[in-house]
Amino acid sequence: DEALEERLSEIRLTKDAFELEEMIRAVEVTKAGFEDIIRVLPRAVGHRRGERVIEGAFAAVAREEGNGEGYETIAASGNHANTLHWIDNDGEVREGDLVLVDAGVEVDSLYTADITRTLPVNGRFTEVQARVYQAVLDACEAALARANQPGCRFKDVHDAAMEVIAARLHEWGILPVTPEESLSPEGQ
């Protein structure tokens, strides 16, 4: 029934103290999993299935501290990071690569965190990697700032991020028009 569906959706938007605690717990345990990923990166380098070394480190924390992984972990190194929702996790991890990890732990209450990070395999970004990483981080921060404004719609959050990305692409000479032109309805 449509009315029930709408009411349930509204209820899901508001969290009580218990739900907030569980969401925070899911994030804390997921963060611990990411910390273990960082610790195993040196072992993953050169391993024929280094992506699985990364996935396994996260899965161990998820199983020990929660119900397990809340969804299939993406551990995509190098060119695999270009494949949307890469879950094979069967590739090598090479020095100089970036590894994209999207993972979350499901805690006992069934709440699941969802964290995505791009990590430099050797612990340091190249100059170009750092510039791109900073642009994405700035876009994320702009989106979060917009999300915290009263009356904000999802589209407003998306637009805030896209404004930053368009500006950076223009600064770097990649965007052939102004950011305003690219973001206008005609530029879409």
Q: Which residues does each PLM region occupy?
A:
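Active-site neighborhoods and metal-handling regions in enzymes and metal-associated proteins
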Residues: D1-Q188
